[in-house]
Each structure stands twice: as structure tokens, then as C-alpha cells.
Amino acid sequence: MKGMNCNEKYILHIENSRAEPVIWENLGKYGGTDMLGTYKIRTDLAVEARERFTEDNVEVRGVEVQEDYNEEKDIRTTVVKITTENGARAMGRPQGTYITIESEGLSAPDEDYHREVSEELSRHLRQLIGLEKEKSVLIVGLGNPGITADSLGPEVIGNLHMTRHLIREYGLKSTEKQILHAISGIVPGVMGQTGMETSEIVEGVVEITRPDVVIAVDALAARNTRRLNRTIQITDTGITPGSGVGNHRNGLTEENLNVKVIGIGVPTVVDAATIVHDSMAHLLETLDEAEQKEFLEEMISPHLHGMFVTPKDVDETIKYLS
């Protein structure tokens, strides 16, 4: 197709493959199945959840989608709004707004280009939060700093300029800016390190510091490998630590914290089973259904479920993204 790179063509080709239903049926034996016996595609990205229906030419009531592509900056923005309970059930996500910013250049060491993407991110944050007036903002860096693919949140905190203590001490005299937001940050770690739920730590900090808004930053899981380290998702529904890899914890949401919560994430891992799906669909296209089932039963290890894959250069990429 015109305007698509070879990877995109390959992905579209295999997703329309006749081998796909058989692959998901067999993967479902090892990877957690739903009522239909099909494999649950694990993704934190609302845009990927929406694409499941698009591929089947199904419109979901209560889900609105807007797409925009900035050709000059090579930035694609997709806004998914879930407006009804029906839409939330179909998408498997809470009602709210999900903004996805995609760009091939995100994983490259280009500071000027990252600045342009940051401006786009800032624009959407202002729309969701409203930063025209001074606000107190708590940034929560979720994830395990000892695991590279999960260290995005802590890395972001390390790169931020905190201002809450300066404002409390000196007021606006500490800056020449007319508007200065009180920024504070915390890296709550993971339960295996602290013995506490992330939500418990954040709830305590929120109760004492009383921010106007909480922004939680976390590494996510994607369905499609081409979105790894090239996509930013912003949502006003908050975030659930560990949900991308199946470690469900109490969510950081407005309902739990009694303050507006914005979730920001970048997918850094993909479920290994989806890679098998993409590879096998192309390989097995020439086999009939019975041969496909026999081959997959022999080849797919039951230990595949729960395994996640990340790019080999993720350590450098995390530095750029943060």
C-alpha cells in the first residue's frame, strides 16, 4: 500500500491471514482464554483494542475515534473516547479519553525531534488538565528501576525539575516566570521491594501534599511490535500498575485518590505469544487447518504464557524517552 513501510505491509498481511484463527485457538490453550476459547491479546493501548473491531469492520457504540497525521513532523495522533458503559465493556477499559501519539523517531537519539514530540505531548496534557492557572502537580514514576524495560517512570522523575519546595520557601521570587506550577515527584517502587501497594504509598502522599492533579508515568505492554518505544498514550482514566504484564494492583484513579489522575505510558514490552502469532501466520499460510493445529501443538511451549519481550537496545531507548 502506498505510504506504508515494509513492516506495516507485513503486519497487515499476516493479520488478514487465514492462519490467524487457528493460531489464536492453539495459543489459547496455553495463554489464558476467554469464553470463546480465543487468546486474550494483552495490550495497554486503547488504540490497539479499538483496532480489533476495525479489522472486523465492526463499529462499537459509545466509542469515538479521531485520527490526525502531521506530515511535516511525522507524528500520528489518535484520540479514542469511550463515552458509554457499553463502549467500556467492549473495549475492556474505563470510560474516558485515550490519546495516542505515534512516531518512528521516538526511539531515535534526536533531541530536536524529541522536543517536537514533547510539545505535542504538552499540548494534550494542557487540554486534559488545564494548566492555564498555577496548579500543584504530583508526578508518580511507576515501575522497577532495577529492570530496564520497567524503569521508564523512575527515569522520568530523575529528569524533572521539582519546584514545590522552592515555591513553598520563596514563592514566585524563585523564578522569572509568571506562572510556576508546584511540581513534586515520587518513585514508589514495587511491592516486592517495599512490601506495600503502590496505591497505598501514593494515597498517603496525596493526603499530605494535596496536589491538584496526579500524573502517573509507567511502562506499558503493546500488542504490535512496531509500536514498541514509538508510542505515547495519555489518558484521563488513571493507570493500574503492572496491568500490562498481568500483575494487577490497585489502580491510581480519581475514584481511589479523590484527585484528577492522568496516566502517561510508553509500551516497552510485547507478549511473546503475539510474536509467535505474527510469525506463524505468515509461515503456516500454505497449510490446511488440521496441519496448522498439529504443527502448533508441537511447537508452542506451555511456558510461553507470561513471557514478555523487549528490544535489545531498550536501555538506550529508555534514556531518550524519559
Where are these regions (language model features)?
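Short glycine-rich or small-residue beta-strand-to-loop segments that form or flank ligand, phosphate
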Residues: T100-E104, S136-I147, G185-G189
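A structural-propensity feature for long, helix-poor, extended segments
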Residues: E176-V205
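An N-terminal, well-structured beta->alpha segment
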Residues: G87-I129
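Proline-aspartate-enriched helix->loop->beta-strand connector
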Residues: V206, P211-D212
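N-terminal active-site beta-alpha-beta segment that forms phosphate/nucleotide-binding
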Residues: D112-S174
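A structural signal for small-residue-enriched, beta-sheet-centric alpha/beta enzyme cores
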Residues: I186-V187, A216-S322
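N-terminal amphipathic/basic leader segments beginning at the initiator methionine
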Residues: W24-Q95, A108
